[in-house]
């Protein structure tokens, strides 16, 4: 560093003495105290620790001549041995143990006063940083003082400055004992003595130097200023030489010092002190008397006294004395000296090695004075000290100034200071005063600043080290290197490690090693200790880090994180709430652990937020997931439980009765608004008041609606609802609005026979309020709407427009698409009729009862121009409204104008006309003209009938209608056809039969039977044509939307369950004329009766069975409606535990005669319920009901075989046998000996089995169940079953009389056609089976023709199948083929004529 460092740095805690500092900041005196109880670690010569050596006797020390360099007092460190207070003077030890060090060859250093002598004494190995003391003496001291005065002498100093620095800037707190080492063998060195090795100073201050000669002589003190050493580069480049050990010489002969030794001393001084120190040492104060102010302890031996006396006699050279006197005259002091503090007594040095582990005999034998004796000073010494204090003169410059800077010798320059100069004062003003009452904790409360080196360091070698003042506690500096130890590293006796073979190379480390035996008090924290912290028993933990054990122990924080987590789950469920997800989410709510009163109330608040805050929303209040049966413990009494239902009702009651509280709040806000000072404040309060009123009104409205829904769920009684109505029936508009909402919700359930008087009173009061007109028109209209709703039997004008499920939306989209498709077809049909030209429709068919959009109908009115009132459609088709006997236009009740138009003059009677008017007014007015059939030839009529029927069969669109028409024919089919047929048709038909019989007079009786069969067949065709004339009515009814159909379905079901009129209900369903939407009727029928009585469910099942038997309801529609219920059955099980039993009661009647096959029904149920694991639940309930009605054996024989099909109903991995045994349905296993089982049967054997079943009078359902139970899937899918079933059915239809006849009733398509009849191959297979049967019967005359006619009329075999059989050349089917073709020639001729007529017509 630069030379701008303070000459001395005082240590504030040790500043003492009664002498005040001078104006220039210098300290007049330095107290050097040596205490008898202080433990010394060795004498320090010139800031160096003493060396241990062998024992010497006092006789070995010889007096020597005075030395020009005084010896500074040795410095001792406390903490060493307490007996070593007396100075130990080594004799030959200093010669043998100290004068051994490598000699370096430094560059010569120029000095102003000439080249001084540089002695090369042996450096002392250093254990710690060396304390540096600068002593400036003013006058000699008498020799007698050396022997009598104690060590503790406060000598006045003229320019005496002593500074002691410790490692890391820590100043010791105790005094050190200075010791003076002397030896008679040491010769006095030249005046400008230099140390060969000195420690690196820590602070920018001048340091005292001690010069030791090779010969044993008293130590000399160099009072020249000490500066910072040079860079380490010089030290690295220096070379070491073997040390020179001088021999003992007389005291008067100074030793000869070689130039190498002088250069070595200079180099070592430069390394330790710096170039600035060398410059200052030349300025003055180099040679002073060593005895001017250096006290010598009285306990020193006589040789030391002699040495001191000799030193007094030594005179300083004249040149140096003149320089000193000149400095005393010229130096006026530094202005900054005023800021210097009083130099305290010499502090002790920490971590100094003990003063020799082997004390010398001198130290052991000598008896030092005790501490009280230290205070005994001579009056002479005291006067000298006072005199020195009064006559202190300014010495050399303590600071190094630049040429252009202000300094005491150049006062005219500007006062400019650079950074380095100012940093030299950083530790001068450091005073630390402890606050009172604090405990003494040295590691926390600092007493001294940590003085780190301020010299420029090499950043590459000391990177990352803080060079500023470090106030960090000592325990935090565990990993940092000690930067304050600047002494050379310890090595061998020479004190320095060898640097390679030639002594070259970089240093190993900047940190010196501690000496052997040195005691260090290191305050450190052992990091490996297991420090136990205070741990709370129930410490708070975040919810994410809580373990299951913590939750089980109930370790919850104060804010109730468990309850908060429950509320979050409830809110999460409510956010996902939709009508479709309601049942699933309701199940989740019931699984929540709502076991405390707080949890119950919080869950209730969250659940009621939506219905209370949004009363006008379309979300129904009954879809609020509430665990009605949950119970929880109260807060005050844990043993008492509170029901969730009770909390819910109390909450609703409180909300209903809080009008007074709200009024008080509103009055208070109104008062604040009136008292508002500014208009802005008044406007703000007004908005707040309106908002509060709106919120309160919405909450009350939502509460009213919710109360009504609770009443519907039977959670509130009628008496409570009547009380609510009475309270709301007041004249304020808000209450009346709530009343209207409540009556709209519960009016239907509250208005029954017993409560009618009270309801009349309510509505009379409402009428009175309307008439008074004291309320607003809005409220009056609301009241009037409620009155109209009661008059319409609580049927709203608009249905509940609640939220729809995704499935409902999809269905509505499909229905809309279907309606658009129907409109397109109708437009295309109308366009085709217009393109034909002339009167619409074929001319030959005008006489037939075919009524369509064209023809004689009036011009159709589109839906867009005028809406259709569908409620009037039921009046048209009511029983009795359409009666063919009432449609009379002529006498006799006949529908021909023969008599009236033939000129007979007969007119219809008035009564007949009056009767006919109501009937004709509701029908097509031109239908009477179309009813008249002209008397034509029988052949032409027959051709027309065949042509019309074949044309219908030719198109695919007519196929479903034929199936529906065929299934609609009941047992009274012949009677209805006879009534609908005109007499002219009957006469023409009988005439045809007579002509045919005359043409074939020789034919046997069997042919006459066939003719009668043909007559019946023609009747069937006529009936089919008449029934085909009904589409105009169905077209009008097909326009019914899904919502309208659902409304009508509700009305039909309610009426049927109330009146139990099966015939009326079937007729109403038929009038709906929406076969593609009847699944809505099925769904609503099952859903509406699911929670009613068992009788209601049984009646609903019978109605659906009757609709299936009559053909009004298809199996596909029934399954579709059933599927929608089964999808929700699992969720319904939560609210309806016996839902599977109730579904079984609704489904079981379907499996009766003419309904759905049992096996097919079970398969369809399994498709949807097996994934849910609920198929077995419904199946077992159905089997139990069947056993009650039919018995176990009959159920088993009907085809229920769980032994083979039980895997479809059981869960995966469940044993079927164990399941059957557990559920006690062993009867379903059946008797394996009686049934052939599912094995391959031949055609003959299969036919015999089927004939056996048919002879028992089994129904179609029984036959199908037997097929499914006894045949494998491969046999069912093959033509073997088709031929066997055809053979068995046709054989059972033959009446074995003479001649053979055919029972047409047995040949119905629903018995023969086990599968789809539209497959041509199956139709040909049936004809082959019939051919084989006829061959077996030896070709009875006309039998095959009768079968062909019956099969054609019943639509069992299609026309294509007939042609395929005719043209077949299969060799396996040629037996009896020729005779069969001959017998049916007339049939094929007639069939081709019909097709030719149709082609000509088109």
Swiss-Prot record:
CDD domains assigned: W2_eIF4G1_like
Compositionally skewed regions (Low complexity) per UniProt: 53-64, 238-251, 359-370, 479-488, 892-913
Where would I find the MIF4G domain in this sequence? 567-793
**UniProt GO molecular function:** mRNA binding; translation initiation factor activity
Q: Name one Pfam family in it.
A: MA3
Q: Which residues form the MI domain?
A: 1044-1166
Residue ranges, compositional bias (Pro residues): 65-76
Q: Where is the composition biased (Polar residues)?
A: 602-621, 918-937
Record's keyword annotation contains Transcription: no
What's noted about post-translational modification?
A: Phosphorylated at multiple sites in vivo. Phosphorylation at Ser-988 by PRKCA induces binding to MKNK1.
Give the main localization category: cytoplasm
Q: Which GO terms describe its biological process?
A: positive regulation of translation in response to endoplasmic reticulum stress
PROSITE patterns given in the database record: MI, W2
GO annotations of cellular component type: cytoplasm; cytoplasmic stress granule; eukaryotic translation initiation factor 4F complex; nucleus
Query: Oligomeric state and partners?
Result: eIF4F is a multi-subunit complex, the composition of which varies with external and internal environmental conditions. It is composed of at least EIF4A, EIF4E (cap-binding) and EIF4G1/EIF4G3. Interacts with eIF3 complex, mutually exclusive with EIF4A1 or EIF4A2, EIF4E and through its N-terminus with PABPC1. Interacts with EIF4E or with EIF1 (mutually exclusive) through a common binding site. Interacts through its C-terminus with the serine/threonine kinases MKNK1, and with MKNK2. Appears to act as a scaffold protein, holding these enzymes in place to phosphorylate EIF4E.
Q: Which family does it belong to?
A: Belongs to the eukaryotic initiation factor 4G family.
General function of this protein: Component of the protein complex eIF4F, which is involved in the recognition of the mRNA cap, ATP-dependent unwinding of 5'-terminal secondary structure and recruitment of mRNA to the ribosome. Exists in two complexes, either with EIF1 or with EIF4E (mutually exclusive). Together with EIF1, is required for leaky scanning, in particular for avoiding cap-proximal start codon. Together with EIF4E, antagonizes the scanning promoted by EIF1-EIF4G1 and locates the start codon (through a TISU element) without scanning.
What is the protein name stated in its UniProt record? Eukaryotic translation initiation factor 4 gamma 1
């Amino acid at each position: 560093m630069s030379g701008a460092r303070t000459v001395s740095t005082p240590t504030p805690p040790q500043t003492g003495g009664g002498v005040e500092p001078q104006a220039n900041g210098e300290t007049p005196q330095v107290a050097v105290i040596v205490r008898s109880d202080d433990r010394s670690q060795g004498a320090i010569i010139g800031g160096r620790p003493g060396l241990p050596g062998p024992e010497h006797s006092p006789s070995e020390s010889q007096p020597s001549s005075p030395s020009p360099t005084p010896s500074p007092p040795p410095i001792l460190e406390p903490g060493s041995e307490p007996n070593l207070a007396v100075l130990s003077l080594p004799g030959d030890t200093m010669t043998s143990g100290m004068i051994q060090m490598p000699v370096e060859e430094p560059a010569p250093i120029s000095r102003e006063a000439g080249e001084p002598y540089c002695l090369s004494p042996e450096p002392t190995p250093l254990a710690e940083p060396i304390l540096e003391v600068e002593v400036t003496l003013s006058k000699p001291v008498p020799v007698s003082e050396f022997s009598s005065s104690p060590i503790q002498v406060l000598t006045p100093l003229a320019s005496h400055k002593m500074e002691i620095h410790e490692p890391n800037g820590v100043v010791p707190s105790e005094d050190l004992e200075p010791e003076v080492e002397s030896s008679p063998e040491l010769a006095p060195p030249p005046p400008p003595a230099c140390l060969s090795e000195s420690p690196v100073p820590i602070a920018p201050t001048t340091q005292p130097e001690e010069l030791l000669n090779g010969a044993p002589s008293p130590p000399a003190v160099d009072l020249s200023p000490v500066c910072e050493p040079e860079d380490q580069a010089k030290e690295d480049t220096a070379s070491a030489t073997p040390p020179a050990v001088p021999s003992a010489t007389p005291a008067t002969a100074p030793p000869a010092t070689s130039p190498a030794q002088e250069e070595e001393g200079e180099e070592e001084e430069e390394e330790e002190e710096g170039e600035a120190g060398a410059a200052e040492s030349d300025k003055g104060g180099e040679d002073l008397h060593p005895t001017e102010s250096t006290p010598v302890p009285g306990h020193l031996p006589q040789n030391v006294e002699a040495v001191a006396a000799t030193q007094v006699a030594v005179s300083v050279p004249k040149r140096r004395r003149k320089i000193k006197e000149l400095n005393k005259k010229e130096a006026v002091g530094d202005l900054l000296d005023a800021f210097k503090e009083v130099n305290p007594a010499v502090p002790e040095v920490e971590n100094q090695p003990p003063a020799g582990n082997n004390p010398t005999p001198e130290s052991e034998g000598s008896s030092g004075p005790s501490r009280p004796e230290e205070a005994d000073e001579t009056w002479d010494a005291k006067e000298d000290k006072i005199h020195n204090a009064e006559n202190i003169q300014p010495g050399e410059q303590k600071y190094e100034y630049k040429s252009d800077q202000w300094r005491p010798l150049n006062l005219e320059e500007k006062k400019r200071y650079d950074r380095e100069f100012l940093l030299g004062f950083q530790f001068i003003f450091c005073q630390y005063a402890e606050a009172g009452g604090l405990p003494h904790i040295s590691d926390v409360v600092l007493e001294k600043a940590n003085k780190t080196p301020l010299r420029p360091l090499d950043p590459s070698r000391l990177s990352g080290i803080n060079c500023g003042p470090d106030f960090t506690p000592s325990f935090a500096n565990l990993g940092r290197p000690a930067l304050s130890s600047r002494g050379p590293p310890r090595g061998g006796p020479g004190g320095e490690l060898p640097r390679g073979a030639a002594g070259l190379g970089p240093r190993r480390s900047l940190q010196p090693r501690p000496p052997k035996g040195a005691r260090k008090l290191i305050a450190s924290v052992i990091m490996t200790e297991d420090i136990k912290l205070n741990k709370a028993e129930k410490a708070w933990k975040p919810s994410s880090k809580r373990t299951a054990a913590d939750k089980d122990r109930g370790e919850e924080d104060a804010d109730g994180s468990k309850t908060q987590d429950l509320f979050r789950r409830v809110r999460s469920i409510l956010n996902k709430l939709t009508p479709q997800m309601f049942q699933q989410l309701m199940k989740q709510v019931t699984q929540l652990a709502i076991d405390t009163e707080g949890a119950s109330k919080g869950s209730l608040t969250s659940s009621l937020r939506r219905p209370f805050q949004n009363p006008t929303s379309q979300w129904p209040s009954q879809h609020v997931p509430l665990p009605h049966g949950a119970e929880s413990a109260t807060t005050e009494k844990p043993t008492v439980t509170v029901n969730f239902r009770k909390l819910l009702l109390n909450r609703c009651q409180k909300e209903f009765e809080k009008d007074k509280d709200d009024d008080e709040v509103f009055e208070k806000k109104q008062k604040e608004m009136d008292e508002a000072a500014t208009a802005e404040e008044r406007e703000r309060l007004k908005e707040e008041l309106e908002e509060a009123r709106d919120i309160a009104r919405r909450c009350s409205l939502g509460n009213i609606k919710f109360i009504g829904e609770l009443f519907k769920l039977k959670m509130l009684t009628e008496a409570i609802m009547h009380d609510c109505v009475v309270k709301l029936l007041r004249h304020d508009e808000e209450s009346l609005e709530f009343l209207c909402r409540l009556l709209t919700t519960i009016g239907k359930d509250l208005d029954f026979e017993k409560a009618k008087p009270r309801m009349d009173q309510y509505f009379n009061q409402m009428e009175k309020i309307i008439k008074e007109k004291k309320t607003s028109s809005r409220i009056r209209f609301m009241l009037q709407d409620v009155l109209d709703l009661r008059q319409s039997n609580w049927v709203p004008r608009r249905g509940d427009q609640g939220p729809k499920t995704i499935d409902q939306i999809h269905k509505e989209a499909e229905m809309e698409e279907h309606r658009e498709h129907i409109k397109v077809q109708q437009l295309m049909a109308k366009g085709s009729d217009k393109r034909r030209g002339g009167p619409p429709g074929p001319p030959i068919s005008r006489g037939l009862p075919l009524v369509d959009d064209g023809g004689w109908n009036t011009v159709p009115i589109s839906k867009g121009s005028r809406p259709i009132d569908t409620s009037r459609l039921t009046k048209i088709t009511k029983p009795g409204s359409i009666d063919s006997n009432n449609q009379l236009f002529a006498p006799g009740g006949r529908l021909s104008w023969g008599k009236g138009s033939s000129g007979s003059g007969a007119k219809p009677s008035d009564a007949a006309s009056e009767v006919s008017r109501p009937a004709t007014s509701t029908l097509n007015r031109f239908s009477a003209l179309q009813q008249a059939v002209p008397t034509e030839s029988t052949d032409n009529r027959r051709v027309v009938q065949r042509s019309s029927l074949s044309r219908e069969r030719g198109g695919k669109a007519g196929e479903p209608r034929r199936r529906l028409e065929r299934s609609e024919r009941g047992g009274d089919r012949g009677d209805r056809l006879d009534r609908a047929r005109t007499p002219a048709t009957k006469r023409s038909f009988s005439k045809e039969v007579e002509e045919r019989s005359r043409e074939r007079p020789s034919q046997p009786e069997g042919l006459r039977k066939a003719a009668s069969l043909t007559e019946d067949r023609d009747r069937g065709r006529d009936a089919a044509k008449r029934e085909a004339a009904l589409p105009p009515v169905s077209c009008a009814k097909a326009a019914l939307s899904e919502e309208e159909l659902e409304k009508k379905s509700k009305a039909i079901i309610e009426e049927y369950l109330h009146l139990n009129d099966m015939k009326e209900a079937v007729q109403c369903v038929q009038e709906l004329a929406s076969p593609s939407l009847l699944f809505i009727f099925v769904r609503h029928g099952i859903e509406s009766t699911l929670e009613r009585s068992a009788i209601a469910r049984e009646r609903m099942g019978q109605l659906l069975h009757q609709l299936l038997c009559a053909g009004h309801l298809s199996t596909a529609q029934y399954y579709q409606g059933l599927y929608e219920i089964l999808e929700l059955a699992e969720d319904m099980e939560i609210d309806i535990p016996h839902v599977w039993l109730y579904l079984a009661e609704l489904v079981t009647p379907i499996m009766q005669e003419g309904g759905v096959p049992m096996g097919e029904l079970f398969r369809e149920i399994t498709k949807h319920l097996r994934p849910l694991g609920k198929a077995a639940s419904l199946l077992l309930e159905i089997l139990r009901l069947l056993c009650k009605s039919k018995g176990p054996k009959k159920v088993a024989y009907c085809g229920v075989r769980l032994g083979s099909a039980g895997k479809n109903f059981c869960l995966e991995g469940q044993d079927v046998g164990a399941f059957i045994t557990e559920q006690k349905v062993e009867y379903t296993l059946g008797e394996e000996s009686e049934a052939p089982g599912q094995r391959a049967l031949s055609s003959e054997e299969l036919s015999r089995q089927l004939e056996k079943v048919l002879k028992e009078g089994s129904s179609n359902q029984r036959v199908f169940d037997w097929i499914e139970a006894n045949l494998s899937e491969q046999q069912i899918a093959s033509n073997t079953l088709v031929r066997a079933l055809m053979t068995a059915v046709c054989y059972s239809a033959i009446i074995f009389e003479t001649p053979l006849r055919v029972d047409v009733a047995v040949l119905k398509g629903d018995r023969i056609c086990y599968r789809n009849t539209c497959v041509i191959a199956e139709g040909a297979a049936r004809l082959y089976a019939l051919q084989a049967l006829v061959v077996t019967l030896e070709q009875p005359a006309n039998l095959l023709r009768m079968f062909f006619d019956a099969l054609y009329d019943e639509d069992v075999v299609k026309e294509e199948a007939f042609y395929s059989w005719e043209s077949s050349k299969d060799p396996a089917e040629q037996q009896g083929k020729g005779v069969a073709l001959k017998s049916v020639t007339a049939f094929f001729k007639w069939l081709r004529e019909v097709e030719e007529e149709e082609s000509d017509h088109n």
